């Protein structure tokens, strides 16, 4: 960055903002880069400002019981704030004084007042000087207030971030990530520009008092008629505002419904294409869009009337002020024009400035109070450690994730006794409440010596992660003692990668030791991966490690933990995403050898790890099931496998929770409308019955992270339906929560509410920060694996990959959740995250405007209609002028003359008409014509938005994956959220305002030019200068705005990155380092924003200077060339003053239109995306064995079997090469093999070898070359839809969209209920669906959050059964499944797909039992294609990965003679499907 010219600028340069000229010149000539931006002054640095505010806030906390953040802000910024406020007031006062001089100038033209004529020139000079003074006062004042607002935002940004790093885990579990981002975007952005309006709260009353005093002098009591009208108008506008809010509230819910489906569609676009659901999704979204647009139109009409009221009110204000006085006393011409000028100022003050100021204070104080509440939340308490301690000891430790259960229970009991329910069954309310306080860990005792390895095992939800959290101090024990040295290193279950190089991620701020670093790299099997990168370990990783595979991320996280020299290493399931061979090597070389002298606690479920551990701790439901050595375990607990793996009583355990959850659900549906709660009760945070099905449940929209939620919490109650939460006066639909994209931080979205098309759980869910930290960003390999060159993160948002226990054991916060969300409005939709795909020109091209206008032919006619009406208005004014100009003047003797006023001219009847006709024609107040001009325009522009949304949706759904792979999913989603919101809301009204203002200015100039032709000569250069200055400024300002957007992205990215890795940060003590990084991101953004504000003020000041010059010219031309016509001078000067304010407003509107049209450019860019090859490249009548084959995919149950293709499922793959993008590197090369009909093939290979990619290539989701045939039919011979319908798919990332069970299973509605129930029976879903209200019509939301991951897999299985596909593709179906669901899937595969070809991609050896052939993929090519027996020869790498116990499972008969009977480990053998009885999930 360059040094800022501001540092050496003179006072004059600072006053006129001349120091910005170098950047404006450079931006006009070339494209600006980040290096061109100036450094910020030290007074604006985040370090200085945060320290200043933090010091005052600490002082406030120390001195008062009820600390107020506003007091701390006052002590920091008050005096500067008031200084600029006084400047602003003085500038506004000049506007009130100008009409006085105008009146004197007009009076000087009175033929009977000759002595005044001589001083007219001096009065003109005085009037021009007032304009100059106003310019010199207002612009520095406004800039100063913007600057203070920026500093306040920076200081509070930093304070919030620092507080976030200190929050306790309990508090983090009650705050959504969306709310925190909302803090830093919507709430704090109010300070940036809103502060300039704040002073009008006191300026406007003073100004109104001054103006009314001056008008009283002219018109006496009549003055209050105009003021009364303005007050009525302001109240009318307030009423319209309330009506508009009502429509916006209703519309917000509809927008959310559309966005939830749209985002699910984008996040799972590969699944949509694999299932051939493009048409179904498009129809679904368009139906929601229709309903939304009806409300959009209503809101737009109300906003139109609100905006029009200001324009059309000018005439009435003057008319009502002047008419009573004129009727009673008669009126002089001077008073009319002076009143007009006063009323222009009065109208702006009362109807615009004062309401805006009140709204600013309301918003700002609300934001400050929310931030204040946040800053007082409970902080993470650092435990006291003894550094001399060598062992790790826990004595009688019990812990809860929640506090104060006794008090909560009493509140609930009291509240429930006051509540009258319709069914009278109060006992249901407490059915599980007594179990709410079940501890997550109970009576834990163990001791491990230095250098020992403790393996912690247990089923999902047993409390394994919670145990590690307690050792780290994240979970405070309610009883017992914990003792260790405090020097901890931690590896999370879900690998966390910060933006930076691989080396920086591993070293993580610890001093660099080359020898140690190399040994860690080698032990974690990273040498081979690093060698593939050109920059080796200096390659820069994106946020979340987007360019790495899940296994690579896991190994880097482990390497970071191992590199740190600590006494105690906590490893939470670090091998979850590694293939068997890699896992085995790392466990041996890293955990057992490299760390041999260190104390290690390893969470694992692998038998091999338990055998090598010094001690084993098995947890079950939060209690110790076993503690000891492996040999003791075999002797004392022969049934331990069931507790370890979750087999024993799993189904009963789940069923118990399932029954209670469904009982509560049904009960809440019956109570939902019967138990209203008073406002008083909600404010007291009383218990209430809501429709919230686990408020803290994951929201796939809010938390776009490839995640699996395995946070170990055991609660006896499935979901606390009766939790305490803060109520809000706002409707649910108005809640907004913004969240960045999981791994790149580029999307910001409104809070998604639920679809209300059937029986559903009306919920407002939020993704807690604690959830965010316990979720994975590397859930195995996505079907579309990332390459380093690619910029798209394929899986934007996951579905809830949750185990059944986790779903049913999720707790609801007992403490009030922090509510800092906002309603959806234009500001909320501002992009928090920059789209780096955006390559839109700095200024919107004329081609974009032309294309936008021609989208809908009606728009052209409407614009012509607007022009015709405008010409009619101007023509009417000119005709009146001509007519009155030719009317002979009235005889002076007929007029009444007041001797009391030395220079008063009494207007006759004719001349009074003259004045009012001119004013009517010029001020654009032909109400009927104005009304008919604007409303059709707004209506048509919304229709254009509807058409563009439809075209963009169709284009995205039909785009090939090779194109979509080059885009960020968050960027696509921003087009449907932010840009469509701009097209719907902002653009129509902004275009209307601009056209309205432009026509007013042109009309006024036309009338002035007719009255005084010399003025037209002065107008031409002013217009030319305005156009040139606007073009000059826009070129730079749009680039600065773009750079500001880019600078904003790292702030939010860093926040989310910090939250994801917060436990790691704390364990490593890296909070100060991350605070420094955050301040650097803030300073970068500040540099861009400050320069944008400065250049904007430069432009505004230059525009005003041009207008001042124009007004000076008009004034002196009028004074020097006008003879005796005081009316003419009055009209010219009044209009010139009006043009001054209106033209500047029009200039700003034109800049806004240009900025908003960039959204249109982005939408057109998506509309122009290429489409998939829909038609076959060969004949659509393929031949098989020389005979014509009738190609038919089963789409309903009534087709004849003879017409069906495929019939057998034979596949032949020849020279298949696959790429993600057109010019990308091949992911698979020259793959050739064949599969016999009905054969089962397993895909084997290391993480990232291309297994999932091969399945995608089968579906033609990638850029492919070569040929694939199914039953002799080539993929070139059929359409894409026909080809993909030949496959049934169970993807790695399960896709459940928001809609009914029926829609999710059969989106095209091809099957009857009987057929759907039959399939549900086959896959074990019937008992689940039947217990929900509405059964098949029950609406699933949030990616099916009420279903476990197993249920979702079964849903995918049911879809495949319904599709009657002959080839089934399974991508790691057993990942994260509980054993029971896994057995059901195995059984269904045997029964429903007995005669189908099955291709299975799996890491687990036991999952491969049914496969006859195995395809080994290595280095993008087929290494081997054979049976497992041949793969397990001595030369095979895979033999090393298969343990003897696995071989027993794979070949039980072959090995039975060699294996002695070992009854004590009989439980280790996999349960056969016969042992798993008819399991009801």
Swiss-Prot record:
Pfam families associated with the record: ABC_membrane, ABC_tran, CFTR_R
InterPro entries the record matches: AAA+_ATPase, ABC1_TM_dom, ABC1_TM_sf, ABC_transporter-like_ATP-bd, ABC_transporter-like_CS, ABC_transporter_C-like, CFTR/ABCC7, CFTR1_ATP-bd_dom1
Region (Disordered R region): 654-831
Residue ranges occupied by any ABC transmembrane type-1 domain in the UniProt entry: 81-365, 859-1155
Residues reported in the UniProt entry to bind ATP 1: 401, 434, 458-465, 493
Record topology, Cytoplasmic segments: 1-77, 147-195, 244-298, 359-858, 940-990, 1035-1095, 1152-1481
Residues covered by region (Disordered): 1462-1481
Residue ranges occupied by any ABC transporter domain in the UniProt entry: 423-646, 1211-1444
GO molecular function: ABC-type transporter activity; ATP binding; ATP hydrolysis activity; bicarbonate transmembrane transporter activity; chloride channel activity; chloride channel inhibitor activity; chloride transmembrane transporter activity; intracellularly ATP-gated chloride channel activity
Topological relation to the membrane, as annotated: Multi-pass membrane protein
Family: Belongs to the ABC transporter superfamily. ABCC family. CFTR transporter (TC 3.A.1.202) subfamily.
Description of how the protein assembles with itself and partners: Monomer; does not require oligomerization for channel activity. May form oligomers in the membrane. Interacts with SLC26A3, SLC26A6 and NHERF1. Interacts with SHANK2. Interacts with MYO6. Interacts (via C-terminus) with GOPC (via PDZ domain); this promotes CFTR internalization and thereby decreases channel activity. Interacts with SLC4A7 through NHERF1. Found in a complex with MYO5B and RAB11A. Interacts with ANO1. Interacts with SLC26A8. Interacts with AHCYL1; the interaction increases CFTR activity. Interacts with CSE1L.
Functional description taken from the UniProt entry: Epithelial ion channel that plays an important role in the regulation of epithelial ion and water transport and fluid homeostasis. Mediates the transport of chloride ions across the cell membrane. Possesses an intrinsic ATPase activity and utilizes ATP to gate its channel; the passive flow of anions through the channel is gated by cycles of ATP binding and hydrolysis by the ATP-binding domains. The ion channel is also permeable to HCO(3)(-); selectivity depends on the extracellular chloride concentration.
Recorded domain comment: Binds and hydrolyzes ATP via the two cytoplasmic ABC transporter nucleotide-binding domains. The two ATP-binding domains interact with each other, forming a head-to-tail dimer. Normal ATPase activity requires interaction between the two domains. The first ABC transporter nucleotide-binding domain has no ATPase activity by itself.
Protein name per its UniProtKB record: Cystic fibrosis transmembrane conductance regulator
Source organism of the structure: Colobus guereza (Mantled guereza)
